[in-house]
From Swiss-Prot:
UniProt protein name: Uncharacterized protein MPN_374
Family, as annotated: To M.pneumoniae MPN_376 central region.
Domain of life: Bacteria
């Protein structure tokens, strides 16, 4: 069951400031789940059938759909793969007797902990270990936070201060939220507000919001785009 969090004494549902998207006379804001900032994870997208036009305007109402934020997807991909790679490197560390080899692996483990590398660089490093087990692999060059973590920290507020072996807690948190339904407060014509399900957690898919308002004045066939008006 979804959980609606009140953020003030009036008992109204939380609305994300400056993130109410509007499609003609229809707008929405996400219902908040605990402390999970859904408005940063889901990006609205207008779907319109450009073949259904008459006199330069659409004859078929568009729908409002969503896609996952690429920054979020990239963060999840790296967190998952790096977590698995840490396990791999730790196993290799136990089997090594050469101090130089062990120092190289420890260096990469430290870089992962400090969010200085992405999983592709670590994949290359592990591959180099497999090619020549007697060779001391070249360390990964890195300075400061890696790009995927910089973006996720800035845009999503992601903080991975735990040891990499505990990063799976973040993955479990994400999985638990997206296994539930996600709702939006939808306002039609600025008069009636309805709570609409926009994410089906059981089937892991987005559900489009149909807009039944007149869209003709918002669409320009020449621009091939919708204006949020």
């Amino acid at each position: 069951m979804k959980e609606v969090i009140d953020t003030n004494t009036t008992g109204t549902n939380f609305k994300f400031e400056n993130r109410n998207y509007k499609l003609q006379n229809q707008s929405f804001s996400f219902v908040r789940y605990k402390n999970f900032n859904l408005d940063k994870l889901l990006i609205p997208k207008t779907n319109a059938n450009l073949n259904s036009t008459r006199n330069g305007v659409l004859t078929q109402a568009p729908t409002l759909d969503f896609v996952l934020n690429p920054v979020f997807v990239n963060a999840i991909t790296n967190v998952y793969n790096l977590s698995e790679q840490v396990k791999d490197l730790e196993q290799r560390l136990e089997s090594k007797s050469n101090e130089s080899e062990k120092a190289g692996i420890n260096s990469v483990l430290t870089q992962i902990k400090n969010k200085q590398v992405d999983y592709l660089k670590v994949k290359e490093y592990i591959s180099s270990l497999d090619k020549d087990t007697n060779k001391v692999s070249t360390p990964i060059n890195s300075t400061g936070w890696v790009k995927w973590y910089q973006e996720a920290n800035k845009e999503l507020g992601l903080n991975l201060n735990q040891e990499p072996k505990d990063w799976d807690q973040f993955l479990k948190l994400v999985a638990s939220y997206f296994s539930m339904a996600i709702y939006a407060n939808v306002t039609l014509g600025q008069k009636v507000t309805k709570e609409v399900k926009v994410w089906d957690g059981q089937n892991f898919q987005f559900l489009a919001i149909e807009n039944n308002e007149d869209q003709a004045q918002c669409f320009s066939k020449r621009k091939q785009s919708w204006n949020y008006c």
